[in-house]
Amino acid sequence: MTYRVIVTPAAESDLKTAYRYIRSEAPRAARDWIRRARQSAKSLARHPERCPLAPESASFDLPIRELFVGSGNRGTYRFLFVVFDEEKSVYILHVRHGSMLPLTSGE
């Protein structure tokens, strides 16, 4: 079963911010990172439930899952998303660096 993947405006902004930061340190790595990030987002179209629940999921009404992207000295980013089985959709809510505090209900 295939899901439609929707990147919310907040997540798109998060991606751009991360890209600009990485680009300021390593332009080539930034291009590779954004390509991997977009491929990872697209991968959620197949079996999004393979990803674990995010630690902050218990604080929200909907289960929030996380997909880890990246590693090494650039760090790992978490794609935080919800799955709506009824409409076969995945909404990527935010993209956060692994060192950031957990998502709060105000974000």
Model-identified regions with their sequence ranges:
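Basic, Lys/Arg-enriched alpha-helical interface segments
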Residues: M1-E66, S71, E107
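Enriched for short, Lys/Arg-rich terminal
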Residues: V69-E107
